[in-house]
Amino acid sequence: MGGCGHDDSEHPPVPAGPDLAAAPADVRWVNYQGVRLPVGADGPRNIDPSAATGFSHSPQGAALAAIVHTVRMSLAPDEHWASIAAHEIAAGAGKDAWASSRVLLSIQTPADPATAPRVRGYTLTDYNPATARVEIYTSFPDGSIAVNTATVVWVAADWRLRLPDPDATEPAVREAATLDAVVRLEAPQ
């Protein structure tokens, strides 16, 4: 006899994916070259002037890696940029182009507090265990807001920044009118 019931055993519930809106645990802030960076239970576990490594294999670890690696590669002083490139940036045409340009300039001092960005949060727009795309929100002393789109890839048991291909036409950084980060991380001023 047929009934109107529904047998869930034929179609078990689909397990929920990772929570892309969950904030990283135990976040504290450390200074790197004049910019405060978030570190916490999801990484980096190892941080020194020459490399920041040891991020959890999770959306939160990917987001922290995207933020930390983007700032560190941008502000790395002359004596550390090659080591940061080796440990924090994934191999590829983007890394090669960045290294070729980086060797032509010199960074000796921290960012000027009058112009330094302040990390405000992020939105994970894509995540799987091999790659994540993160929109990083920063604000500046003049009140402007920037969104840097960064991609990290899981390589050698850690998240590394994959720099855009030099021929890419989509800008990595854009201006935003509002702070629309899904996960708010407020660096101290």
Name what the model sees in each region:
Residues C4-D7:
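Bacterial signal peptide processing site
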Residues S9-D42:
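N-terminal low-complexity, Pro/Thr/Ser-rich intrinsically disordered segments
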Residues V27-W29, V35, V147-A177:
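Short beta-strand edge/turn micro-motifs at domain boundaries
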Residues Q33-L104:
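Core segments of small alpha/beta cavity-forming domains
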Residues A90, G94, S100-P141:
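Surface-exposed, charged secondary-structure patches
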Residues S139-D142, D167-T169:
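Solvent-exposed loop/turn segments at secondary-structure junctions
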Residues E175-Q189:
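Glycine-rich, aromatic-bearing surface loops/beta-hairpins
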